[in-house]
Amino acid sequence: MILQILGGALVLIGLWRVSQLVPGTTAGEPDPGVEAPLMTEPLAKNAAASVTTARAELEDLDIKGRAPKTGYDREQFGDGWADLDDDGCHTRDEILRRDLTDITLEAGSDCVVDSGQLKDPYTGTGIDFTRGQDTSTAVQIDHVVALSDAWQKGAQQWTAATRERFANDPANLLAVDGPTNAAKSDGDAATWLPPHKAFRCEYVATQVHVKAEYALWVTPAEHDAAKRVLDACHALAPTH
């Protein structure tokens, strides 16, 4: 994840077009021919979303209250991590391969990450990852826009296929410190921000971009919190 200064604007983490829609479709309308790409390169090599873009997207988002959480279950977004591109690798391992360095793979596997190093974006600290029953949770894959948050802000109306694609969309996923991810829970920008302040611009811009691509809405408090962060981004130096 790389931040660059371009034309005086802070350019943030590269993002895939979230829903990878084909012409004639809109967010929430699944296209059965769309496949999620294998993400093995840093996102910044594919595209970039700037603070300026995120500010504009934020102002275009619908603002209203949360819908009831009634009916929410993780399985509404699919049965765990999927293999949407049918390459034999589940999304969790694809994100670990993308975000960790110095990785080793399980013997005989092209997918399963046995160990690696993470520079955690949420805390700014380094984490040694070792796969195992008692150690894997040290690094978790976070949905930047939490699934429960999405459920209460538009995803209830999606098809099951769209929800599964959202849950496995690399643009909305980050490998992060496990305890910090647990503390975040299903918080939005109004209720939780990364402790690592230098990453907050990137984090909020990613949330806004994902919500814009999937036509999710924000609450008034969330809108105001995201705006405060984005308006202050010019004062922040790159995180890397």
Regions found by a protein language model. Name each.
Residues 47-54, 112-116, 173:
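Compositionally biased, low-hydrophobicity segments enriched in charged and small polar residues
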Residues 1-28:
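Alpha-helical transmembrane anchor segments and their immediate juxtamembrane flanks
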Residues 54-58, 92-96, 100, 226-233:
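Generic structural signal of hydrophobic/aromatic residues within well-ordered alpha-helices
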Residues 68-140, 144-145:
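Secreted/periplasmic proteins that engage bacterial cell-wall peptidoglycan
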Residues 113, 122-240:
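Domain-level detector of nuclease and nuclease-like folds
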Residues 16-19, 90, 168:
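Intrinsically disordered, low-complexity proline-rich regions
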Residues 22-89, 222, 238-240:
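N-terminal module-boundary/linker segments of secreted carbohydrate-active enzymes
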Residues 6, 61-63, 182, 193:
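Alpha-helical interaction segments
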